[in-house]
Design a protein with these regions (language model features):
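Beta-rich accessory regions
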Residues: 106, 110, 116-119
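Acidic, His- and aromatic-enriched active-site or binding-groove loops in soluble protein domains
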Residues: 93-107
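Substrate-binding/catalytic cleft of secreted carbohydrate-active enzymes
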Residues: 1-94, 113-116
Length: 119
């Protein structure tokens, strides 16, 4: 089931745990909007808010679940599409919507924790 609005709870076990679709924070970047309505799983009002929410999602929701066996992630979604503006890149693929350094830092923190736990 999709889990956009509920706490993430990975239970330790003998199987691989994957978060196969998460994120979906909408923000229509000015000058790069798709031609139709805008949709996402929660809406940010600015690039700064989008970046902050991405960091918080990674730090407070995903990172703590690594110790329980979370092993794979798929962020929704890579780029905006006609009816959804919840991508990391704009509809025209011309701009990364959140701050690149902040995204890199959040992702590197996940990678470092995963490496620490799986050594």
């Amino acid at each position: 089931r999709h889990n956009y609005f509920y706490p993430l709870r990975v239970r330790p076990g003998k199987r691989v745990a994957a978060l196969s679709e998460y994120g979906g924070i909408a923000w229509p970047m000015p000058g790069h909007e798709p031609p139709r309505r805008t949709y996402g799983y929660g809406t940010a009002k600015s690039r700064a808010e989008l970046t902050e929410r991405y960091q918080k999602l990674q730090r407070d929701t995903v990172l703590p679940q690594l110790k329980n066996g979370l092993s794979a992630l798929v962020y929704t979604q890579v780029s905006d599409v006609e009816d959804e503006v919840n991508g990391l890149f704009t509809y025209d693929r011309a701009a990364l919507k959140p701050d690149p350094a902040a995204v890199r830092a959040a992702n590197e923190a996940l990678e470092a924790e995963f490496e620490r736990l799986t050594r």
